[in-house]
Amino acid sequence: MAEERQIPRMKTHYFEVIRKALQEKFNYKNAMQIPRIDKIVINMGIGEATADSKKPSLAAEDLGLITGQKAVVTRARNSIATFKVREGMPLGAKVTLRKDRMFEFLDRLVTIALPRVRDFRGLNPKSFDGRGNFAMGIKEHIVFPEINYDKVDQIWGMDIIVCTTAKTDDEARELLRAFNFPFRS
């Protein structure tokens, strides 16, 4: 007997509400022109990785808990003597989320994690790259509910990049605003 999968809340919200609102606002001629979130890339760069090579694998475990997907340990592409980095040395971890996992992570990020960030005044609306992609940083990975605060030996930050199919930053900003991203005014 096949197990019935539950469609993520943000995904149904996108298809039932957001698409229609964007269609009306920007007057798209084709349904494929309506912007959507393509992928979310989460990266943890571990600065202390040069001293202890086990830290990137610990970060990858935490990132796997947060996202529900196995993280990849990132390695140095070339050696940099001033930073004591050798080629192939593990430096961090990253995950690329797509489809349902992406929408589930987006829901947890907007509703749970961002409100838990200390001294949070909203996301910078200027953090777009000019092509409709949005980048943000979080200083503590413990704001996510999947991380048990008592078992954490070190707190790491992370970069979160939301890639969209929007052609302009204004379209992407409206898309993310519709997903309840708390931008500063």
UniProtKB/Swiss-Prot annotation:
Gene Ontology CC entries for this record: ribonucleoprotein complex; ribosome
InterPro entries in the record: Ribosomal_uL5, Ribosomal_uL5_bac-type, Ribosomal_uL5_C, Ribosomal_uL5_CS, Ribosomal_uL5_dom_sf, Ribosomal_uL5_N
Membrane spanning stretches: none
Keywords linked to the UniProt accession: Ribonucleoprotein, Ribosomal protein, RNA-binding, rRNA-binding, tRNA-binding
Stretches assigned to coiled coil: none
Domain of life: Bacteria
Gene Ontology BP annotations: translation
GO MF: rRNA binding; structural constituent of ribosome; tRNA binding
Pfam families (alphabetical): Ribosomal_L5 (PF00281), Ribosomal_L5_C (PF00673)
Function, as annotated: This is one of the proteins that bind and probably mediate the attachment of the 5S RNA into the large ribosomal subunit, where it forms part of the central protuberance. In the 70S ribosome it contacts protein S13 of the 30S subunit (bridge B1b), connecting the 2 subunits; this bridge is implicated in subunit movement. Contacts the P site tRNA; the 5S rRNA and some of its associated proteins might help stabilize positioning of ribosome-bound tRNAs.
Subunit structure: Part of the 50S ribosomal subunit; part of the 5S rRNA/L5/L18/L25 subcomplex. Contacts the 5S rRNA and the P site tRNA. Forms a bridge to the 30S subunit in the 70S ribosome.
PANTHER family documented for this protein: 60S RIBOSOMAL PROTEIN L11-RELATED
NCBIfam families to which the protein is assigned, alphabetical: PRK00010.1
Family membership noted in the UniProt record: Belongs to the universal ribosomal protein uL5 family.
Name of this chain's protein: Large ribosomal subunit protein uL5
Organism: Bartonella tribocorum (strain CIP 105476 / IBS 506)
Lineage start: Bacteria, Pseudomonadati, Pseudomonadota, Alphaproteobacteria, Hyphomicrobiales
Gene this protein is translated from: rplE
